[in-house]
Regions:
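Active-site core segments that coordinate phosphate-bearing ligands/cofactors
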Residues: 5-7, 107, 114-177, 183, ...
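N-terminal glycine/serine-rich phosphate-binding loop of ATP-dependent small-molecule kinases
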Residues: 1-96, 124, 230-238, 421-428, ...
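Short beta-strand-loop/turn "lid" adjacent to the catalytic site in phosphate-handling enzymes
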Residues: 63-100, 129-135, 168-191, 216, ...
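Active-site donor-binding loop signature of nucleotide-sugar glycosyltransferases
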Residues: 31-33, 217, 289, 470
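Short linear loop/turn motifs
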Residues: 212-221, 328-332
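Carbohydrate-associated surface elements
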Residues: 103
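Short acidic capping loops at alpha-helix termini that bridge into adjacent secondary structure
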Residues: 21, 69-73, 97, 209-214, ...
Length: 496
């Protein structure tokens, strides 16, 4: 039997999963990665630690599976998006820590571009809004802040890319400097209609094109893993941004299907087919994937920066829980939040507000407020943000989203999913396999390796675990959403 090795490199950990041809998990391994916070608003990773965590978990997963690497037909990679790495081509060593998607250090530069009237050009070419979230300004910052960075980039001494590019470079022993269209579409440097790096955008951010990887289809030939890593050469047959991978893993492969991933952040994506639909409500237009030589497929996306990360803050910052799952027990101890509202804008607000100056806010506290109320308000704060995204997406499409497919670690919380259904007034549908990010990468790698002939052959893979239906009245829902809007207003422009 053939196997697929999925490498899932996320914001807080790296996971490797071995799947069989039926897409059943044979074995897996996971390792946390360290986030560094050198200054307020700055978030970094050690790119070598990321590489070592991926390599070690891959070896561990293969060993646990009791197979040899020769039975692995393909490697599929999925990764945290926007995070950017710059390294020396000769040594393969990073020249600076990776700047993470959550990092806000380039807020002022983005504001200056907006004031100069650049956002229309950027949005038309990339589908994105001028925000420090995306890779271009991070890459520009690195080149400007390392010794001779710009000169070294222009001379061809340096290479750059998102996490997929970095991992493929290391896996292939430096023989393949490549990214896929889904990751490239998040850099703010690729024209999403042509699928090529855009010369005007490279000029805007002062980034030499020679530093960037080749853009490849999501599913196809992205290089070959060097035999020194696993004892045999293995083809890399997919690379895909984590949210697009989850969209594929949920089999949202037809226009109109929608999913939300609850991870470090929350990400709502709706498949729009081969049409790059522009948003009038400050959502993003992004490439979903490209399978082989088929046309590019697109999605509309809303991004929330703080999802599961808000629960981590309860654990690591406030210390009111010892582990993330404890939030459910604590929050279940009260019937509601007691009028407490928590806006988890710790690193600003994403869609549809795009306010890097917003900050985390807790409102409605009284002497009767307890840690349980704060815990419940945190879960509600996550769900309120997703409700904002759904409302914006429905305005864009003019159509009601009747079912929201959910995945990601935090969706294992029945309480959070019930709160989400209540605040949406919609069915929330959770699959049996909630880790659809790695699954999507495995599916795309299998397609690239010819294990399955087409997407239709995968249609029977997905099965539903539970459907959550609303349990509150429309009046209750509207009142809570109205108060949430007031809370968001208080949190905005705090640092302005």
């Amino acid at each position: 039997m053939k196997h697929i090795l999925a490498l899932d490199q996320g914001t807080t950990s790296s996971r490797s999963i071995v799947y069989n041809e039926r897409l059943e998990v044979v074995a897996s391994a996971q390792k946390e990665v360290t986030q560094h916070f050198p200054l307020p608003g700055r978030v970094e990773h050690d790119a070598l630690e990321i590489w070592e965590s991926v390599l070690s978990t891959a070896r561990e997963a293969i060993s646990k599976a009791g197979i040899t690497a020769s039975s692995i037909a393909a490697v599929g990679i999925t990764n945290q998006r926007e995070t950017v790495v710059v390294w020396d081509r000769k040594t393969g060593e990073p020249v600076h820590r990776a700047i993470v998607w959550q990092d806000r250090r380039t807020s002022e530069a983005m504001s200056a571009f907006r004031e100069a009237g650049r956002e229309q050009l950027v949005q038309h070419r990339t589908g994105l809004l001028l925000d420090p979230y995306f890779s271009a300004s991070k890459l520009s910052w690195i080149l400007q802040n390392i010794p001779d960075g710009q000169a070294r980039a222009e001379s061809g001494e340096l290479a750059a890319g998102t996490i997929d590019s970095w991992l493929i470079w290391k896996l292939t022993g430096g023989s393949s400097h490549v990214t896929d269209v889904s990751n490239a579409s998040r850099t703010m440097l690729m024209n999403i209609r042509t699928g090529n790096w855009d010369p005007d955008l490279l000029g805007l951010f002062n980034i030499p094109g020679s530093i960037l990887p080749r853009i490849s289809p999501t599913s196809g030939d992205l290089g070959t893993v060097d035999a020194s890593h696993f004892g045999t050469a293995i083809p890399v047959r997919s690379a895909v941004g984590d949210q697009q991978s989850a969209l594929f893993g949920q089999l949202c492969t037809r226009p109109g299907l929608v999913k939300c991933t609850y991870g470090t952040g929350c990400f709502l994506l709706a498949h729009t087919g081969t049409d790059a639909v522009a948003s009038a409500n400050r959502l993003l237009t992004t490439v979903a994937w490209q399978i082989g030589d088929q046309p590019l497929e697109y999605a509309v996306e809303g991004s929330v920066f703080m999802g599961g990360a808000a629960i981590q803050w309860l654990r690591d910052g406030l210390g009111i829980i010892k582990s993330a799952p404890e939030v459910n027990t604590l929050a279940s101890g009260v019937p509601d939040s007691g009028g407490v509202y928590l806006v988890p804008a710790f690193t600003g607000l994403g869609a549809p507000y795009w306010d890097p100056d917003a900050r985390g806010t807790i409102l409605g506290l009284t002497r009767g407020s307890t840690s349980a109320h704060i815990a419940r308000a945190t879960l509600e704060g996550i769900a309120f943000q997703v409700a904002d995204l759904v409302a914006a997406m429905e305005k864009d499409s003019g159509k009601k989203i009747s079912v929201l497919r959910v995945d990601g670690g935090a969706c294992a919380s029945d309480l959070l999913m019930q709160i989400q259904s209540d605040l949406l007034g919609r069915t929330v549908e959770r699959p049996v396999n909630i880790e659809t990010t790695a699954l999507g990468a495995a599916m795309l790698a299998g397609l690239g390796a010819g294990i399955w002939p087409d997407v239709d052959a995968l249609s029977k893979i997905r099965s539903v675990d539970r459907r959550f239906e609303p349990t509150v009245t429309a009046t209750n829902r509207r009142a809570r959403l109205k108060t949430w809007k007031r809370a968001v207003k208080r949190a905005r422009n705090w640092e302005a």
